[in-house]
Amino acid sequence: MDFNFTEEQEMVRDGLSRLVREEYGAETRREVIGSEAGWRPEIWSQLAELGILGMPFSEDDGGFGGGAVDAMVVMEEFGKGLVVEPFVPTVVCAGGFLKHAGTTAQKEEHISGIIDGSRVFAFAYAEPGGRYDLADLQTTAKQDGDGYVLNGHKAVVIGAPWASHLIVTARTGGD
């Protein structure tokens, strides 16, 4: 079994390593997290141009058909620079939910926007007193016509101020 990275993974790793090294010095990072935005849309655009945001999506969805090892390469390089752009909530969480559970219409509406960087998601899952237990879910979603009415509270939603879309966990039935 070969545990070496592929040539493409090495290229991604080298490119991201260079980007992180050039754009994420300690002082720059402090300035970015202290800014009103808390991240840099221009870096997000660069990640889209480099194909990083489209890596885990199938070619049918406009992506590059990458897998878990490709995501690991990206996350390792992001971790080295403590990158603050919303890759996890947008590409990993929202993209993963859409890829595995989204309808065809939802995929068509959102995945291309994730890939080109025009859509940014935040994940609203934590509830007051919930201690990050996803089964301890009090927020409800009641069907109303073609949509749902949400009722409940969420605790801190990291990235909500700059997100174009939210994914909200809610109970549609049961206790």
Regions found by a protein language model. Name each.
Residues 117-125:
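A short, Trp-centered hydrophobic/proline-enriched beta-strand micro-motif
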Residues 2, 13-17, 28, 69, ...:
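Glycine-rich phosphate/cofactor-binding loops in nucleotide/flavin-utilizing enzymes
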